[in-house]
């Protein structure tokens, strides 16, 4: 065998070895990726999981709205310029909020540990109640100033500020929103999902009684979104009713709304397990 043939044989052997090594490493990498992607698959959320998360989101929305309603019912007291100390403390407010929530859901927040609500909801409802009290606490000084006709604490400001406090603590998406034609606060501008849901709620056939919601699983099955509609009641019309365009106590133009029409919604987004 010539020297040239020997050299060619050695080179062929080295190439074969490199290919063999590369092949083995390629197989190892493929197996590793398969194990990573398929070996421990994330289980899909069950229908029961979805129902529990949806109910938790609904309860959060109802609780925030219960606080809004409590604030709305106390507007004459809060804005009474003839009185100093109104006695509308965070504790008094919380009792009213708890009572309204129980009336609407049957659940007593004072006995939440034994309440028949999803486990996920319990700490979140407790915290939302605390953040609601904090919002009212920040207004105590101005509420009790005599001679001032408008104190700034209305259902809308309560909802926006409390939602922001709760979201800062929990990372959970919670906000008020409204159709763009009724929007007063740009922070509450609806996203695409909210706009579509609000459009459904504006339809006269959408139920006005009970706690009917619009819900959808989003993010490829990773989250649940819930919208709770807010329909105008009689008390709302002092700011949002006729005559359209006239300034209300807050300085905004009235929308000319009628009782029972859609005023907005509370939007919640929770992750699925």
Regions found by a protein language model. Name each.
Residues 43-231, 245-273:
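Extracytoplasmic c-type cytochrome modules immediately beyond a signal peptide or single-pass transmembrane anchor
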Residues 1-22:
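N-terminal secretory signal peptides that target proteins for export/translocation
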Residues 12, 40-42, 242:
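Intrinsic-disorder/low-complexity coil detector
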Residues 18-19, 34, 42-47:
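Contiguous N-terminal and early-domain "leader" segments and peripheral loops that mark the onset or edge
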Residues 232-244:
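The canonical Cys-X-X-Cys-His
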Residues 28-39:
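Bacterial N-terminal signal peptides
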């Amino acid at each position: 065998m010539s020297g040239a043939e020997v050299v060619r044989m050695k080179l062929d052997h080295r190439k074969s070895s490199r290919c063999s090594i590369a092949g083995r490493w390629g197989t190892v990498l493929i197996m590793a990726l398969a194990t990573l992607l398929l070996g421990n698959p994330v289980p899909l959320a069950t229908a029961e999981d979805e129902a529990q998360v949806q109910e938790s989101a609904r309860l959060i929305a109802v609780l925030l709205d219960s606080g809004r309603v409590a604030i709305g019912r106390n507007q004459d007291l809060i804005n009474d310029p003839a009185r100093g100390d109104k006695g509308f403390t965070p504790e008094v407010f919380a009792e009213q909020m708890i009572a309204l929530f129980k009336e609407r859901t049957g659940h007593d927040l004072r006995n939440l540990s034994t309440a028949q609500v999803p486990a996920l909801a319990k700490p979140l409802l407790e915290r939302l109640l605390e953040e609601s009290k904090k919002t009212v606490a920040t207004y105590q000084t101005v509420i009790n100033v005599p001679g001032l006709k408008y104190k700034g604490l209305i259902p809308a400001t309560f909802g926006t500020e409390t939602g922001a406090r709760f979201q800062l603590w929990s990372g959970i998406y919670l906000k008020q929103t409204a159709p763009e034609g009724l929007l007063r606060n740009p922070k509450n501008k609806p996203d695409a999902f909210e706009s579509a849901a609000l459009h459904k709620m504006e339809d006269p056939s959408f139920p006005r009684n009970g706690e009917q919601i619009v819900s959808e699983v989003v993010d490829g099955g990773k989250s649940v979104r819930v919208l709770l509609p807010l329909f105008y009641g009689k008390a709302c019309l002092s700011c949002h009713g006729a005559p359209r365009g006239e300034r209300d106590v807050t300085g905004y133009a009235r929308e000319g709304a009628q009782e029972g029409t859609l005023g907005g919604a509370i939007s919640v987004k929770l992750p699925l397990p």
